[in-house]
Amino acid sequence: MEQERIMQRVQKDVRSLLIASKNGLSIQELEQDYRMMIGSQIPLRSLGYKSTMELLLDMPNVVQIHTQMDGTVNLSAVVDEATRKIADLVSCQKDRSTARSRNRRRNIRPRCPVDLVRRGRVSPVLPATVKSDLRDLLSLSPLLLSELEKAFFSRFGRSFQYTRYGFYSMLEVLRSISDIVEVKQTRTGSLLVLRKSETGHISASLCVKKSLDCQPAAVPNKTSCVFEKCLNEPQRPEKKPSEPATSLKISPPEFQKFSSQEPQSITSSRSFLHSSSNKEPDVNRNVSLGESKKSIENKTSPAVPSNNVVLNNSLVKNSETFESLFTRMSKPVSHVEADHANASEPNSSDLNWLEKKLEKELKLCLARKGAGGSVSDDLRSDIKHVVNQHSNGLNISLLPTAFKSFTGKDLPFKELGFMSVMELVGSLGDILCLESTDEGKDWKLFGAKKEDLVDEFSAGLRSTNSSLSSWNSTRQSTAPLKPVGTIFSKVDEKLWWGPLELKVCSTEQIDIPPDAVRNQKLHCLPRIKHSLMIGVYVESIESPSQFYVRCCGKDTSEKLEDMMIEMRHCYSNECVSERYIVPDNCISVGQIYALRVPGDVWWYRVIVHSIKNSELLDVFYPDFGNVATVKKSWLRFLKNCYMKVPAQAVPSSLPFVTSTEAQWSTQAIKRFRQLCSCLPLVGLVLQYVQDVLVIFLCDTSSAEDVYLHQLLIAQGLAKMEPEHACKKVSRNTFMHYLTPSQEKPQEESSKSSVPSESSQSEVLCTKETILQVIDEVDPEMPYLEAFPTDTDVWDENWVFSDGAGGSNTTPTIPKVETQKQENKISKEQKQPFKFCMDSGDASVVHRPLEEFYISLIKSSKSQESTDIQQSSHTEEQHLAEKSHRCTAEQLQGGSSSSMLCEKKLYYENKDLTYCQQQSKCSFSPLIGFQKLQIPRSATPAALGPAARLATAGRLLYWASDSH
């Protein structure tokens, strides 16, 4: 009742979806529309179906299935009386060109998890190896259709993915293999049964049967008694302890076929022979004691004849093989007695001949069991005849042409499920031999040397018959026989008895998924602009000079989190996790994989750094920068879709600081880790040195901005480097595992590093010195809003206009109010100050204001009580002369005077004196960066934490209005 209710609901929903579509829907579009309308997938499992096509085939009163010329399936609704009016309205709708193009595009690239192979009118063919696997699986026992995939996976270790071969459903697969598989309907469901034995086996059994039936009625009495006693008579061990009891078990294929195909004839002939067996003398046979019980058990069940004969060292003189028995049974009695009379000495090479024949028979059976078993006997004989016509061998590339010239037909290797002629020839190892040409560019085909096998077989029969005919002879052989042993011969590497596909798969032992990442490198993040402020998380700290940072933003940290969530959802599936297991022969240094440590729920991208032993290896986390030792069994192949996000960890270093000793102390490293733990910091990019990012770090979560490098110096854990410490940065050892970003690196500024004294003096010689005078009145400090540590401290989508913040391409000269201020500024300029940036850059904003993430709210101008008076023309001329005199003094003073600059420009605010305390023994932490001027006419707005960093570095100050 429940299934009927679900079926009625599904039929109603499917009908409504198909009626609403004028041009019909494909199967994928129907599944997508059903999921969008209902909110869940089509309940196939609840209704007992494996695919949507099977469900639609059982709804002929709802769905019409149309097959297009390109092989695609189009679905339309069956209109009834209740829905006829709606269908008429839908058919009257006007088609839109955009809708048609959209539908056509969907048909070309359907949105489905499996990209099915698009085929035309040619029906797909199941590969011969897969067909052989199905025949092998069903030969054990019949299987239900619902249990086929599970049984296939448990036996062969891989899933039965029929969609890879062009099939849309299991129904099409069963139709293509109807020659070997039969479907029977039972109460439990569809039962897959292997069809009866093939024509080759049947013909072999018939030949054996005819050889028995063609004998005269009076002849087989004596010969048949011998054959019957060999099968069913209890064995009596011979009292000769000096002879070893080494035995060999032989199962001739001919007799096995005979016993399995004609059990009734065996039983009837056995009963007839057994009635006359008492008239014959007892035949002594030496067998092992362990095998005598099996012969007795076989005697109790006459319907199942014995398939095995046990031979020992006395086999040459006291036993008889099946081949000799069949040969003797086809002879008259006179010939058999003549063979007994013509007894000869036993030969020690008989056992070697039996071993070789057994080995050849096993190889032939294995070749028949593989993909070559699907080739018919007629095709085998034709191929063999074509190859035998060329005594010097036939090139495998010329086989299709020679076959067509002989038979008038094309070589049907594709119809049999073989991908190439080489694969077909590889499956026919029982009739063909392959040899490489002298050049090694092609293969030559030779027919199997059956003549030699027949001669060897007949010679072995003659020697065996002559030795076995002396059963009742009293002569003893003085020559000792060698015990039977196992001979291991070196097999030629070019010889392959099975199909070529199995030879390729045997080297890897596991199927590597097609979307697994192999021999690829992860991309780095694109380089960040000089003087750009970013939010960072500090990861994997070794010292203040060696650590990793991870950028925060929608394109960096958020994408990484989304990718890790997808990896967790994907690899948590047991089937997916088992399929992507990395074998030991696929693990190599520098390759990227997926990893999950037991006890952790997240999957990470890792790169193998070194292999310690057979179980442990060192891996590098490209997204976090740390190195860990893990087990090989924890690795999984990384899917190719997880390579889009670049490596997030950026090797970094603090500039202009070094350790107080030869190496960084443990206390300094511990303190630096405490400052960086669990806090998003604001970083100001200085430059790149050997792929290492030199960056300033500032903690803006407290009331005052804290520069980490200055704090370490103040606490005595580090010292200021007088030279450029960034030049001494060592190259990161893990960067060769990554490849540069495909995006073009952002343009570096013209002043990517701290300007030297010589460069500053050159700039001062070519540019006019521009003095910026700041009002003596203490400027109003802007309100610095607090922000929580768990939120972003910037907005990447904020766009500013070029004119925001009073940016101007021409330098502005503030007017001088009084002579007192002018003298004061002139006095400060004469004081030497090192590492001062160019005064021309101080008044010019070369970069857009949005790089500093500062938002300024425009407001109406407020009238200032103390307006700056306009200077006269004489004052401007006096200012220009004073500027020219200042420049001349700097040129005469050399390197010390070339660094003169407005000290008040950097130390304007008297409240923030943290950096000023270190100015005697160091320089400004943000030397070389641009300064921003905020016009006094604008009311101060709520500046973000990034603006606070600029304010603490004296890059943001109030400028006087110029009228």
Swiss-Prot record:
Segments forming domain Tudor: 586-645
InterPro entries associated with the record: LOTUS-like, OST-HTH/LOTUS_dom, SNase_OB-fold_sf, TDRD5_LOTUS_2, Tudor, Tudor_domain_containing
Disulfide bonds: none
Database matches in CDD domains: LOTUS_2_TDRD5, LOTUS_3_TDRD5, Tudor_TDRD5
Domain HTH OST-type residues, every copy: 6-79, 122-197, 375-449
Compartments where located: Cytoplasm
Keyword Transport carried by entry: no
Keyword Protein biosynthesis: no
GO biological process, one term: spermatid development
Disordered as annotated region, ranges: 232-306, 739-763, 803-822, 864-891
Main location: cytoplasm
Family: Belongs to the TDRD5 family.
Protein name: Tudor domain-containing protein 5
UniProt organism field: Xenopus laevis
